[in-house]
């Protein structure tokens, strides 16, 4: 199957491989179809467009007058998705713009697309970004220390590793990688500078984390650097807050996360409308909860999907429906 195939029609509906391409294999696409779409003639946004797999899945369950807008900061992803969905672009059912989902409100205002009926977030890094050594996301291959999702702008991992002080590096590894060896690794990175490639970075980390902890430690370190380079958690908090403003009452948000830092923020915001996980009351004593989880708790991939796409193993899909502001006083469950 080539990157520009809309889907593999030889694969039955509901099969996790149906919307996969060499660029990226979207996870939980059947669940997204079933739970995000509330109006088949509605307006939907895939704010993490990638190779267009989820956008294709949404278009397949929308009526001819339903539309999907794709947003991505990666120019390669935009080009791939536009080529893949060329027929839908021609029909006016799909279009894509370059941008970050942290600017969701401004993007939608520019496209005259407020309110929307549904918002999809498939967080983290794509398969393509990991698999291309030149992007600098993988510790397994030699590549430049880049890690930018938009390679045309912003801070690189090389600038962080070589330019930040030991204390700042330690804090990054501890906060964004939840790495217990953060202090030791930060000190070793500073001693080994300058570091210019992914393998040079990986070798320093490997010296600090012998087997059996090596791979997990490398994963956490590269995750931490990627998060800070792309301001991923800041962007996530911004898009969740803006979703409350742009999704219509009765519309939905679907967010797929891959690690606890993402999932914790999504869970707390969709359950409580804040990132502290604290029930809050307005001036009249009413509990403020702009979203209602549906269902309560995460949806995870089944065995067949994990077998077909191992990346799905860590995926957590959370879906919530925008409440009417007058209904926001419903009882709230405790945060588990």
Curated annotation (Swiss-Prot):
Residues given in the record as S-adenosyl-L-methionine binding sites: 52-54, 72, 101, 122, 129
Reactions this protein catalyses: cytidine(1402) in 16S rRNA + S-adenosyl-L-methionine = N(4)-methylcytidine(1402) in 16S rRNA + S-adenosyl-L-homocysteine + H(+)
Entry's EC annotation: 2.1.1.199
Principal localisation: cytoplasm
Subcellular location: Cytoplasm
InterPro entries to which the protein is assigned, alphabetical: RsmH, SAM-dep_MeTrfase_MraW_recog, SAM-dependent_MTases_sf
One matching Pfam family: Methyltransf_5
GO MF term set: rRNA (cytosine-N4-)-methyltransferase activity
Superkingdom to which the source organism belongs: Bacteria
GO BP of this protein: rRNA base methylation
Keywords assigned: Cytoplasm, Methyltransferase, rRNA processing, S-adenosyl-L-methionine, Transferase
GO cellular component: cytoplasm
Similarity section: Belongs to the methyltransferase superfamily. RsmH family.
PANTHER family: 12S RRNA N4-METHYLCYTIDINE METHYLTRANSFERASE (PTHR11265:SF0), S-ADENOSYL-METHYLTRANSFERASE MRAW (PTHR11265)
Cited function: Specifically methylates the N4 position of cytidine in position 1402 (C1402) of 16S rRNA.
Name this polypeptide is given: Ribosomal RNA small subunit methyltransferase H
Species assigned in the record: Salinibacter ruber (strain DSM 13855 / M31)
